[in-house]
Amino acid sequence: MDKMADVLGRVGAWCGQNKYLSAIKNSFQTFMPLTIAGAIGVLWCNVLVNADSGLGMFWKPIMALEVINPAFAAMQFATISCITVGITFGIAQEIGEANGETGYFAGLLGLACWLAVTQSGWANYALVDTAKQTLELTADGALQTFTGVAGGALGATGLFTGMIVGVVSVEIFCALRKVEGLKLKMPETVPPGVARAFEVLIPAVITLAIIALIGRGCELATGLYLNDVISTYIQGPLGAIGSTIPGVIIIYIIIGLFWLVGIHGNNMLSAVKEALFTPLMLENIETFSKTNDAKSDELHIFAMAWLQMFGEFGGSGVTIGLVISILVFSKREDNRTIAGISLVPGLFNINETVTFGIPMVLNPILGIPFVLAPIATLAVGYILTVIGFCPKAVINTPWTTPPILHGFLTTGANIMGAVSQAIAIVVSILVYVPFLIAYERYQNKQAAEAAE
């Protein structure tokens, strides 16, 4: 156990000090309030004020509010559908700060570099025959081209490109900033803000040119924009690897092992989870906003909110199952006291009280279900989703949303989502109970030996 703790401790220290992982984690955490705001927009348009599949089917008066649906749809577009803009800026800014840059120029440069490699024009066609799906160029057959960023690149599809370009561009810029010959020195009479603008001018121009040339080279070599290449050959395969039950299980085993040596496992793997599962969640939200069907085959199962729904209720290790087990089955007053204190925080998915109060750290008995319980609940959730009993995750909810309510909201206000999460809670209790009994026997034995 000590050897494992030492190895995981070194890995955890490396993860915590790695500026790239920290930049990804911090950027997604900073953007989270906007993601939730966008999810509220989806909830309003698709679940509440919707006459086809929402509350409007059963309570017609609410449809009087339909006139403001476009405003809530705009909330979704400005946040979820444009997440790459915010994440690219955030990651570039974080990398700049890690390299000693002040102000927000690094973020602006990263965003400009991403725009330089993103499709910015398309042909306008008119649909002539809907039945045959034939297309004809508008304006008497003349090609009409419009400038502007391709909408698909703004959302989940462009996320990996934005992350990569945000990191690479600012690293190039910071390296060039160290070259004294590239700094334009201005007279002391020039205001500091203007002087700094000229100081970074040449490194910024070179950086932007390098990234733009890479994008153009990619287009000439492959016939595809850089975003399409990254989305197809990097983001797609990584998502495919992560969005499998073995991949998810491995991630949650590692999270549990980190916790058992006193390291916040979710923080350590936050960047990995965000990169793999947030794009899938965003695609689910987009699809649901168009189909209103939370069981559509187009939706991904392993989206971020789904993982939180089945693998993190009550906190890491799904410890709400342990808290309930103690309150129902424990015969030791000390454990019951800790569980009583931990119940309310646990209902909001905050579990440090029970994790460090029992404690779970370096606990060879309760450490086993701490790792196994999330695997069991994820497996059950996967089965329930595959057979169509549980809808898929289509709405982002705050991570502090209580279990069962979380399942209800995440699945588009579907009662079967709440029922499915309740089943997962029962499964977590069943996993913890036998180990709790064994642990209390061990505690009693230790107490008896100490009394002799």
Q: Language-model segments: which ranges?
A:
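Alpha-helical transmembrane segments in multi-pass membrane proteins
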Residues: 37, 80, 84, 88, ...
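Early transmembrane hairpin of solute transport permeases
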Residues: 17-183, 361
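Transmembrane alpha-helical segments and their short flanking loops
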Residues: 1-15, 50, 54-66, 138, ...
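Interfacial/capping segments of alpha-helical transmembrane domains
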Residues: 39-64, 123-136, 218-237, 264-280, ...
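Membrane-embedded translocation segments of transport machinery
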Residues: 215-216, 220-330
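Cytosolic juxtamembrane amphipathic/interface segments immediately preceding
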Residues: 5-28, 65-69, 186-196, 353-355
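Hydrophobic alpha-helical transmembrane segments
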Residues: 70-87, 154-161, 241-261, 296-317, ...
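Membrane-interface segments at loop-to-transmembrane junctions
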Residues: 186-198, 233-238, 357-359, 364-365
